[in-house]
Amino acid sequence: IRGGNMVGILAFEFEPIKRKSLLKSLKGITQRLCKKNAIDPADIGLMVHTGTYRQNFRQEPAFAAHLQQALDIGCANIGPTSKHTFSFDVSDGACGPHHALETIADLFPVIGCKYALLTAGDCRPNKETPWPHRPISFAAIISEDGPLQILDTRFDYEQENDFTSSTKFNKKYHTEAFTSKPHITK
């Protein structure tokens, strides 16, 4: 087993979106988390958002970039001594949160920041799209040494194949096999 990094949740919160926009909901949650936990938002150097549905089914710009701008994190002029914030989306349906956590764990040592922000949520794509859902928004502040250690990305490359992703959740070894078979439609 080689590589891998441990990350933990320092703080998290979720709420129904209701009539608020996803952006306003996540901005409010993030600000509350930072205030409750005495976290300087400027110490967030990585932002990853995951979700399936976006307004008008748009892919770019990334939702995380909109949230970064709304929170005014790392938006100052860039210079040799300025703090930078890397933000992007991971859209992979139900696997999105899992992949977002793996991405954060892998990028922490490279980016060298104190905290990462993981957000998740969906919004109604447009007024024409049927929307029977009551979506929630979720935000978590992740650190390399949070009290709730949730992900260890060490991987046994001896067992690797094209259909296996291994990770360790809650200190239990967990393997997921992903296969795809063609479906014939008439």
PLM-predicted stretches and their roles:
Residues 1-17, 28, 103-112, 117-125, ...:
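Cys-dependent condensing catalytic cores that perform Claisen condensation/acyl-transfer
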Residues 1-52, 59, 65-76, 145-186:
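Conserved "HGTGT" condensation-loop signature of ketosynthase/thiolase-family condensing enzymes
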Residues 43-51, 79-88, 114-121, 151:
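Beta-strand segments within the central parallel beta-sheet cores of soluble alpha/beta enzyme folds
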Residues 54-114:
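Conserved catalytic cysteine-centered active-site region
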Residues 137-143:
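Short beta-strand scaffold segments in enzyme catalytic cores
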